[in-house]
Structures are given as C-alpha cells and as structure tokens.
Amino acid sequence: MSLELSDVKRLSTLAQIELTTEQSAQTLDKLNGIFALVEQLRAVDTTGIEPLNHPIATMLPDLALRLREDVVSEANRRDDYQKVAPATQDGLYLVPKVIE
C-alpha cells in the first residue's frame, strides 16, 4: 500500500492541519516508509510462533514478572460522597445539561 500526495492533503484537511507543499511531500515519504515496514512485517510467516508476554522472556525463560496481587486498598466511600452531592440517581452524579 502506498499513498499519494492527494491522500496526504485530504488527511491533513480532515485533521485540520495546515501543511506546506514541502511538508506534505515529507509526510508522504514518511508515511510510505511506515507502510513499507508494515508490509515487510506482514510478509513474515509467524505460523506456530507463540506470542510473547515480555520481550526478554525468550532470553531469560525463568524470568518472573513482578506483578502484585490485585487487592482493594481503599474503602468504597461512594455513598458518603453522594450524600453531599447536589443530585444523584442510581449511584451516578447528575449534572446540568450543557449541550443542546
């Protein structure tokens, strides 16, 4: 896949970014370079290769990841906070409508 200058101009318009002709050409080269790398990655046969959890896992198979237990460290004080809120409903805070 490769882009053309018209694609870059359309993308810059959609993103509301003003680019000069020179900047558009540079951006085109960079984007086409990225797409070329993606195509190279797609060409690699990864059949039978397990995904990695950690990039060093292949070099150090006994590596133990330092993960802590997922435990609650604070009390649930939602009811206390909602008592002083101006308006709540079903555990949610009600706010005035700001967009018509």
From Swiss-Prot:
Q: Which UniProt keywords apply?
A: ATP-binding, Ligase, Nucleotide-binding, Protein biosynthesis
- Coiled coil feature spans: none
Q: Which InterPro entries does the record associate with it?
A: Asp/Glu-ADT_sf_sub_c, GatC
SUPFAM superfamilies, sorted = Glu-tRNAGln amidotransferase C subunit
Q: Which Gene3D superfamilies match?
A: Glu-tRNAGln amidotransferase C subunit, N-terminal domain
Gene Ontology process terms (BP): glutaminyl-tRNAGln biosynthesis via transamidation; regulation of translational fidelity; translation
Q: What EC number(s) does its UniProt record assign?
A: 6.3.5.-
Tell me one GO molecular function of this protein.
glutaminyl-tRNA synthase (glutamine-hydrolyzing) activity
| Entry annotated with the keyword Ribosomal protein | no
Catalyzed reactions: L-glutamyl-tRNA(Gln) + L-glutamine + ATP + H2O = L-glutaminyl-tRNA(Gln) + L-glutamate + ADP + phosphate + H(+); L-aspartyl-tRNA(Asn) + L-glutamine + ATP + H2O = L-asparaginyl-tRNA(Asn) + L-glutamate + ADP + phosphate + 2 H(+)
A Pfam match is GatC
Record-stated family: Belongs to the GatC family.
- Quaternary form? Heterotrimer of A, B and C subunits.
Please explain the role this protein plays, according to its UniProt record: Allows the formation of correctly charged Asn-tRNA(Asn) or Gln-tRNA(Gln) through the transamidation of misacylated Asp-tRNA(Asn) or Glu-tRNA(Gln) in organisms which lack either or both of asparaginyl-tRNA or glutaminyl-tRNA synthetases. The reaction takes place in the presence of glutamine and ATP through an activated phospho-Asp-tRNA(Asn) or phospho-Glu-tRNA(Gln).
* PANTHER family given in the database record: GLUTAMYL-TRNA(GLN) AMIDOTRANSFERASE SUBUNIT C, MITOCHONDRIAL (PTHR15004:SF0)
- For this entry, the protein name equals Aspartyl/glutamyl-tRNA(Asn/Gln) amidotransferase subunit C
